[in-house]
């Protein structure tokens, strides 16, 4: 079996039916023309935010990470492992792709520890066991994995989806594409940066050009590039016409170098 390609989905994509249609059309075409197994990892911040708003619950973030109190983890897990995950499974079904919905703890695919007590139920993902997902891939299933995990002592944790995808890529020895709302990492003038090294990222963070959630995304991509020993792509799901080229290894956003 070829090494898998992990596609991490996030941002407001889950709220955009036209974009989901284009994305799944590109996935179908890729699966038909390549024997390479695919895995989807997803967050769903927009789904969580809508639910929190409907329940009149405050949304707090610290350094780009969602603060998750004990009384909110059940709601967030329901939104991500439930609504967001099943929405993607429904799109896969519509496009005749046999898919399986998972969370990080299934088959110990990704291990999770608590990141910081101040953040509450927020986890740090670490490589786990490839056994379950490899079994699914060998049988032509598309695993769709939410970014909810569980600690060794059974505590549910909300994990940043970029970081979750990175840990799963390390588990499977997979290539990784991080799809987001933006077309890549932008410089101070709003221009896309084609390639990014750790030194350059540090410089842009110090200058306040890379901020908030993008810091988390860039650090996850740098971690992945180092762990995997190969580049990681950050690109936008908005450019549907370019997705086939991206899946084939052509950079269309920012390529993060190890």
From Swiss-Prot:
Keywords: Amino-acid biosynthesis, Arginine biosynthesis, ATP-binding, Cytoplasm, Kinase, Nucleotide-binding, Transferase. It is an enzyme of class 2 (transferase). ATP binds at residues 181-186, 209-211. It catalyses: N-acetyl-L-glutamate + ATP = N-acetyl-L-glutamyl 5-phosphate + ADP. The record marks 8, 217 as: Transition state stabilizer. Substrate binds at residues 44-45, 66, 158. GO terms for cellular component: cytoplasm. SUPFAM superfamilies: Carbamate kinase-like. Pathway: Amino-acid biosynthesis; L-arginine biosynthesis; N(2)-acetyl-L-ornithine from L-glutamate: step 2/4. The keyword Magnesium does not apply. It is found in: Cytoplasm. The keyword rRNA-binding does not apply. GO terms for molecular function: acetylglutamate kinase activity; ATP binding. It comes from the Bacteria. Catalyzes the ATP-dependent phosphorylation of N-acetyl-L-glutamate. Belongs to the acetylglutamate kinase family. ArgB subfamily. This is Acetylglutamate kinase.
């Amino acid at each position: 079996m070829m090494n898998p390609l992990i596609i991490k989905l996030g941002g407001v994509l889950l709220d955009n039916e036209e974009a989901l249609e284009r994305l799944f059309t590109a996935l179908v075409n890729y699966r038909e023309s390549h024997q390479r197994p695919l895995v989807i990892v997803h967050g769903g911040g927009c789904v969580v935010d809508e639910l929190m708003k409907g329940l009149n619950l405050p949304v707090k973030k610290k350094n780009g990470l969602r603060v998750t109190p004990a009384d909110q983890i059940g709601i967030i897990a329901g939104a991500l492992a439930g609504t967001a995950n099943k929405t993607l499974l429904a799109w896969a079904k519509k496009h005749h792709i046999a898919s399986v919905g998972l969370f990080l703890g299934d088959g110990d695919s990704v291990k999770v520890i608590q990141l910081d007590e101040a953040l509450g139920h927020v986890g740090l993902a670490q490589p786990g066991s490839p056994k379950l997902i490899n079994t699914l891939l060998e049988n032509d299933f598309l695993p769709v994995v939410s970014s909810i995990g569980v600690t060794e002592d059974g505590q549910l944790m909300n994990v940043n989806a970029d970081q979750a995808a990175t840990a799963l890529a390390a588990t499977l020895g997979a290539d990784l594409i991080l799809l987001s709302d933006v077309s890549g990492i932008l410089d101070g003038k709003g221009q896309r940066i084609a390639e990014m090294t750790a030194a350059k990222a540090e410089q842009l963070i110090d200058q306040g050009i890379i901020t908030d959630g993008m810091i988390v995304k860039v650090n996850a991509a740098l971690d992945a590039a180092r762990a995997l020993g190969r580049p990681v792509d950050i690109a936008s799901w908005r450019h549907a016409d370019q997705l086939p080229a991206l899946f084939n290894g052509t950079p269309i956003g920012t390529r993060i170098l190890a």
